Amino acid sequence: MINPIALKCGPLAIHWYALCILSGLVLAVYLASKEAPKKGISSDAIFDFILIAFPLAIVGARIYYVIFEWSYYVKHLDEIIAIWNGGIAIYGGLITGALVLLAYCYNKVLNPIHFLDIAAPSVMVAQAIGRWGNFINQEAYGKAVSQLNYLPSFIQKQMFIEGSYRIPTFLYESLWNLLGFVIIMMWRRKPKSLLDGEIFAFYLIWYGSGRLVIEGMRTDSLMFLGIRISQYVSALLIIIGLIFVIKRRRQKGISYYQE
């Protein structure tokens, strides 16, 4: 088993979980800051937004997780802030981040559609890297299986949990996000192939579809009244993305995404 603590200096412990999230964030900000000027948004606007959105998204992700695991946390109130042990829900972070983005664009008089198109590929990369934090913490895994011989030994060892090998759902989602990133980066380079806003819509449909399937393999899903919350949210994202594309294609005067 991999030690979840990457570095310890006296009482200060730096967890791999945090390093994975921060690594994803740094790469995402870099990519977004390079793309933003092409859409008339300064790199400084990206940095300013991240300084506001990232901490709020972490809080939102934690609140989302705690709400649906309240039966546990009501008895362990001291653990509510212990995010270094894992337990932040991506959908909580995405919802919070989207709300902050809309508020930021309104305040700075920026086009939110352009901002969302810039953010979507970067978010995919951040999620792909961040999922490895779940791997280190041995969370977000799937059902028990007899073997994982198709995977490298270090993954097999880390996925041996509670006496059984587990489906590495973290890996599936990480690769799914990475594949989505590659597709959209290639697609958006083709002239007049995507309308403004459709990169964001692609993200909603792509991530929602992958998460809908992968969530069904997991054994630690957040539940509400016996329902896997993330599957319903995923289905909602797909519907929103499809409706957005259909309406966008029917509208006249919508400009094409241009690099």
Curated annotation (Swiss-Prot):
UniProt: a 1,2-diacyl-sn-glycero-3-phospho-(1'-sn-glycerol) binding residues: R131
Any one annotated GO CC term: plasma membrane
NCBIfam families assigned: lgt
Alphabetized InterPro entries for the sequence: Lgt
UniProt keyword list: Cell membrane, Membrane, Transferase, Transmembrane, Transmembrane helix
Organism: Streptococcus pyogenes serotype M1
GO biological process, any: lipoprotein biosynthetic process
Enzyme category, top tier: transferase
Protein name: Phosphatidylglycerol--prolipoprotein diacylglyceryl transferase
Parts of the chain that traverse the membrane: 12-32, 41-61, 80-100, 109-129, 167-187, 194-214, 226-246
Chain's gene name: lgt
Entry EC no(s): 2.5.1.145
Highest taxon above the source species: Bacteria
Record membrane topology: Multi-pass membrane protein
Pathway(s) it belongs to: Protein modification; lipoprotein biosynthesis (diacylglyceryl transfer)
Role of this protein: Catalyzes the transfer of the diacylglyceryl group from phosphatidylglycerol to the sulfhydryl group of the N-terminal cysteine of a prolipoprotein, the first step in the formation of mature lipoproteins.
Compartments reported by the entry: Cell membrane
GO MF annotation list: phosphatidylglycerol-prolipoprotein diacylglyceryl transferase activity
Family: Belongs to the Lgt family.
